[in-house]
Structure formats: C-alpha cells, structure tokens
A protein has these predicted regions:
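C-terminal substrate-binding/catalytic lobe of Rossmann-fold NAD(P)-dependent oxidoreductases
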Residues: 1-27, 101-204
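Rossmann-like NAD(P)-binding element
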Residues: 22-41, 51-52
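Structural motif
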Residues: 33, 57-58, 193-194
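Rossmann-fold NAD(P)-binding glycine/threonine-rich loop
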Residues: 37-44, 56-79, 84-88, 92-97
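Anion (oxyanion) recognition and catalysis
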Residues: 47
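Short glycine/serine/threonine/alanine-rich loop segments
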Residues: 51, 75, 132
Length: 204
C-alpha cells in the first residue's frame, strides 16, 4: 500500500495523495480508521511520533482499551468507534427509556458486507445502554453503503421503535474532522465522544 495513491486504492480514482510511512513535520494529529487487529504495531507507531490520536477503529477488546489508556499518559488519545455525534445523542435517549419495564428489547444493525466486526462496535455500544448482550444483536451485511441501527422496545400495550441511518460514509469523515478541530490542542488524557458531545451542547 505504501507510495500508492490513496484515491486509487479506496475509490479507483487518483487524488494526488500518496500513502507514506512517515509523517510530515507539520502534522497536527493522527486520525486512524484502520483495522484494530494491528493495534500493537499502531501503538509502536503512535509512540514514535507522539502526536494526538483520534482512534476510530471498532472492535477493540478490553486489553486494547487498557493499552490505549496507558498511551494517553504520553499523548492525547480520543477513542471514537463512531464519529457521528447523533449516535451518542441516541444513546442518551436509550438511557432515558425505562428498559427494565419493557417485556422485550431487540437491537439490529446493517452494514456493508466488507465490514469485518460482527456485531459492529456501535451496535455493542447501544446494546450496553439497555443491558442487551452482544450475542442477542441481529447482524446483517449487504451490498449497500448504508449503516443502520434499529432498537425496539415492546411494553404491555405500547411499542417504541428507534432507527438511526447513515446514508453516506462521508458522515464519519466529517465527524472526525469536527473532533480534530476540538481535540488537537487538548492536554494528555483519554477522551471519548460523550465529553465532546456534552461540550458541543454546552454541558460541563
């Protein structure tokens, strides 16, 4: 992949941007959307350059979270498995629903067939808000680029259905850039989307 056109690799159209091994001196931060399975080599790379990191990979395990937490003592680390702020507004809404009184709760997610983790990190995050184990999440992979998460609560005589859809994955890139503007001069610490969203909404 090194020295290949990033546009040619991802979109089959050259864009003048080349994959390089080294960062330029004026790099402000690193945004990482790559596969989380290479975490050890990534951490070695992050330590070498000591730049703030927005870590957008999904599917990291507890050990990976501990490694990133330790890394945040050396440089600012922002963990954002989903860079859409509306997902975190949705999570707050789910917490406000009295899930314990529901007779049945279901969570489903649909992503492009190239997505590796099943279920997605976002689906697991949403399931955690209502106490659903990840093996109960319904997973669908399709040829569509849409990302869809659905949550259904069934009560005695009522049903609540919530759906969040992303129709174009550029939403994630735009979200990452908004985070970058807020984050790149922050002090060494571990950051999450909740803090970012609360500050945007004027909460401390």
């Amino acid at each position: 992949m090194l020295f290949r056109s990033s546009g040619k690799f991802h979109f089959n159209k050259k864009n003048g941007l080349i994959f390089k091994k080294d960062l330029s001196e004026n790099t402000d931060l690193i945004i990482d959307f790559s596969n989380s399975k290479q975490l050890n080599s990534k951490i070695k790379f992050f330590k070498e350059y000591k730049k703030p990191v927005i870590f957008c990979s999904t599917g990291i395990d507890k050990n990976g979270e501990k490694q990133l937490h330790a890394l945040s003592k050396l440089m600012p680390i922002f963990i954002a498995p989903n860079t859409s702020k509306n997902i975190f507004i949705l999570a707050a809404l789910l917490r406000d629903i009295n899930a314990s009184s529901a007779g049945y709760i279901s969570i489903s997610e649909t992503h492009h067939k190239s997505k590796i983790d099943r279920p997605s990190g976002t689906a697991i995050f949403l399931a955690n808000q209502v106490g659903i184990p990840k093996n109960k999440i319904k997973v669908t992979r399709s040829t569509s680029n849409k990302s869809i998460h659905k949550i259904k609560f069934i009560f005695n005589d009522e049903t609540i259905e919530i759906k969040h859809s992303i129709n174009d994955r550029k939403v994630f890139a735009e979200g990452a850039l908004k985070i970058a503007k807020w984050f790149y001069q922050k002090p060494k610490k571990l950051y999450h989307m909740q803090t970012f969203v609360e500050e945007l909404n004027g909460k401390k």
